[in-house]
Amino acid sequence: MPTKSTFSRWKKADLIDLANKLEIDGFPNYAKKSDMIDYLESHLNHLEKPVDFKDDYPELRSFYESMTVDQSKDERNEYGSGSGNGSGSGSCDTATNDSDLEKAYIKEDDDEKPQSGDETSATKPLSSRNANSNAKTNFNLLDFSTDNDSSTSAFTKFKFNFQEYLSDIRYQTQKLNENVQDYLSTISAVDTIFSLLEFSFLVRNILAAGQPTSSSSLASSLEAAVAAHNKYQYTLDFCLPILTWLLFFRGIPTLVSYYINFIRYDLNIELDPMTFNLTKFLISLAIFKTCNNKNIDFHSFRCVNQLWTQLCTVNRSLGMVPLVFSMVSCLLTLYVL
């Protein structure tokens, strides 16, 4: 593996695109850049055969070229060490003589080293030694570099890597945009938008119907004051139509579509959108037709009359809106599926 990776100059977004192109499973998209590079190089090194970097993956040409250079260096080092071992094992007598000579030379060098050190220390001028001691105590001359090469210091290596943060923000924004587009292009998202519109129309009309009259007569003012003090009845008048709408326009279609999908044993989706919208369409049509029929009377049944009153309130507030929305959803479901 090369000492300095060829991917070090790449951006994180480019590394993620390359991983998607190589179809790498479990690639750490939210990890550090160094971890991404290690994971990518480990995957490329453990492949059975190199990828086609001439036609399919031209961006990997520099990576494989650097691998070839490193392998040639390793082979050269192994060849040099092997040739040295072979020449050393040619003859026992020659090896013994060479070792004796090496020991003698080493001993002579050890004897000469203290003398040379003393001579250099003696010949070193006093001013230079004072300058070195002053440099150690002068904090303005401190050197924080840890490398042997004086041209590269720790200050040149430090950087904030703002481009990586900017690339992360751009990648996250692009990912969020794609997720929003994928969600809004589904039938369930369309049904959710239609339901929110129906709910807003219902709440607006209920609140408009519950406002007191603007008449200035004394009787109307007293009635408005009594109605204002009757908080319990006002809460019921506001909550019961909403609960009725949730039951008939959301609850029953959801239950029917879930049951039909459960019978079909389709694990890809939880609710059948066609069954949901068709059930909602039939319920909306039945409520709209029945509420507009003046000949039906449910006053003899108190519970049915209360439920029917709430259904008529919902029908007066929404009109044909649920009917139209469910029909549009059915057509969209047929178009998509």
UniProtKB/Swiss-Prot annotation:
It comes from Saccharomyces cerevisiae (strain ATCC 204508 / S288c) (Baker's yeast). InterPro entries: Put_GTT3. It is a multi-pass membrane protein. Present with 1300 molecules/cell in log phase SD medium. It is found in: Nucleus membrane. Residues 66-95, 107-132 are annotated as: Disordered. Disulfide bonds: none annotated. This is Glutathione transferase 3. Residues 117-132 have a biased composition (Polar residues).
